[in-house]
Amino acid sequence: MAIRNTADNYGTVAKWLHWGTALLFLLSYVTVYYRHWFTEEQTPENWTALQLHLSVGVTIGVLVLLRILWRVMNPAPRPEPGSRLAQLAAHAGHYALYAIMILAPLTGYLGTSVDTEYFFLFDIPKFESTQVFALLVTGGFGISFEQFERPLDFVHKQLLGEWLIWMLVTGHALAALYHHWGRRDRTLYKMTNGKI
């Protein structure tokens, strides 16, 4: 299997980045729902689940940057034949997925009120503690962290977390299955090992 993308298939790196990101997004939901459904506030279990969620979010952010860099250096395989409208819908869907892959970790980091204990190995300071926050947000706009955090929390938790991510990921998965079973083309094979 080729490391780089070819005209017909995604390479190993693109596949690992795709499925790794998907797995981490799922893990991020598992940790946050575990925290809300099975732990009490101010308990060690709640804190552990929160720190795992934050750590996974930071990892997703790094992987997404790597995905974008890899995509720029290594173009995607050519699309399967289809109507112009289908091609536009696929491109719009992918741009929307990349947007949420950037926005979810970014709004999560910017809006968190605690340091991230990155997989309990080292600390990543919360944005509120950085000089950038002091200079731009407090100094530049004259707003407190609470005022800054409120819209970020809404975007991260309600808009993205509860709605948009699920809608886009479900649409992406259904489109892949439609290509596989409805159109019977190679779209799904390109991102797997070809044995579906």
Please place each PLM-identified region on the residue numbering:
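Membrane-embedded alpha-helical bundles that constitute the cytochrome b-like, heme-associated redox core
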Residues: 1-196
